[in-house]
C-alpha cells in the first residue's frame, strides 16, 4: 500500500512540474552564435511547447541596427519562421517574445554572424 501511495505521489508531482513548465528555445536556424557564409533567407525558431501566434513575435536587426525581418512571423505549432530582407555581412541580433499554449510568456535573444570573422 505504501508503495502504491509513493508511486501515485511521484507521478502527481511529475505531472505538476510538466504542466507548469515554461517554453524554451529548443533550436534555431541559423544556429545561436554561429557564423554562416551567406545571409539566410529566414530565421527559424523551434520551442519546447506550442505557441500562441497572436501573442508571439520575433525581430531581427542587421549590422547597422536596422530591422531586416520581413514582417509578421509564420507560426505553426512550436515553430516560428520569419523571412529576412537582403542584407550583407556582419552581426545579426534576433530577439523573440512568445506566449506558449500554457499561457507563460518567455523572451530571449541571440546573435549570429554572416561572412568572415
PLM features: residue spans?
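A glycine-anchored, Pro-Gly-centered beta-turn/N-cap motif
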Residues: 88-97
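Extracytoplasmic/periplasmic copper-protein system
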Residues: 22-26, 32, 105-117
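Short beta-strand segments within Ig-like beta-sandwich modules, predominantly Fibronectin type-III
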Residues: 71-76
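Cleavable N-terminal signal peptides
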Residues: 8-9, 19
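Short strand-edge motifs at loop-to-beta-strand transitions and within beta-strands
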Residues: 78-82
Amino acid at each position: 500500500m505504501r508503495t502504491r501511495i509513493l508511486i501515485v505521489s511521484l507521478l502527481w508531482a511529475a505531472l505538476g512540474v510538466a504542466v507548469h513548465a515554461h517554453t524554451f528555445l529548443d533550436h534555431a536556424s541559423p544556429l545561436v552564435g554561429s557564423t554562416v557564409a551567406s545571409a539566410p533567407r529566414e530565421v527559424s525558431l523551434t520551442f519546447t511547447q506550442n505557441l500562441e501566434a497572436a501573442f508571439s513575435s520575433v525581430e531581427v536587426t542587421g549590422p547597422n541596427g536596422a530591422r531586416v525581418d520581413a514582417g509578421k512571423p509564420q507560426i505553426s505549432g512550436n515553430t516560428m519562421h520569419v523571412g529576412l530582407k537582403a542584407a550583407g555581412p556582419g552581426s545579426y541580433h534576433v530577439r523573440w517574445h512568445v506566449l506558449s499554449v500554457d499561457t507563460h510568456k518567455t523572451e530571449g535573444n541571440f546573435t549570429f554572424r554572416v561572412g568572415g570573422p
